[in-house]
Amino acid sequence: MKKQFAVFGLGSFGESIALELQKLGCEVVAVDKDMERVNGIADSVSYAMQADIGDPEFIRSLGTRNLDAVVIAEAESLEASIMAALECKEIGVPNVIAKAKNNRHATVLKKIGVDTIIFPEKEMGVRLAKNLMSASFTDWIALSPAYSCLLYTSPSPRDAH
């Protein structure tokens, strides 16, 4: 059975998540209040709809509790983000991931019980800085605050002489 996800907020971050999940063979419901954004992605995902993600009635009517996860990519409207996260947790969505605008927003999301809180711009900035520090590191992922997994390109034997 295909995994099913909802992505709330179709800015560049949300849109890229929705498109990649769809490309990976998942069923994706993409939601935004801006009809232009909805129209821009409608032909590329399973379902695209215009709605206010801060409206609990909408979230319940969507059947979100039956999804594998909901990604709340909307962080400009703190109220909509928080209300969507609260409703998703209250109705039993198994995995709620939310983008935080700032540390206070993240604190509220954590208190609501959001499973994963992300700061995409901050995380990408740290990742890029670490990549810039060594031409040998081609990629890395943080496993915990103390451990990382690195993809390292070793120099060719003739460069070692």
Annotate the PLM regions.
Residues 10:
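Glycine-rich Rossmann-fold phosphate-binding loop(s) that bind the pyrophosphate
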Residues 14:
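N-terminal Rossmann-fold NAD(P) dinucleotide-binding loop
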Residues 27-28:
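Short beta-strand element of Class I
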Residues 32:
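Conserved acidic E/D residue at the C-terminus of a beta-strand in Rossmann-like folds
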Residues 35-36, 103:
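Helix N-cap at the beta1-alpha1 junction of Rossmann-like dinucleotide-binding domains, i.e.
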Residues 38-39, 106:
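Short alpha-helix immediately C-terminal to the canonical SAM-binding loop
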Residues 44-134:
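Phosphate-bearing ligand-interacting subdomains
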Residues 152-161:
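Single conserved hydrophobic/aromatic residue that forms the stacking wall/gate
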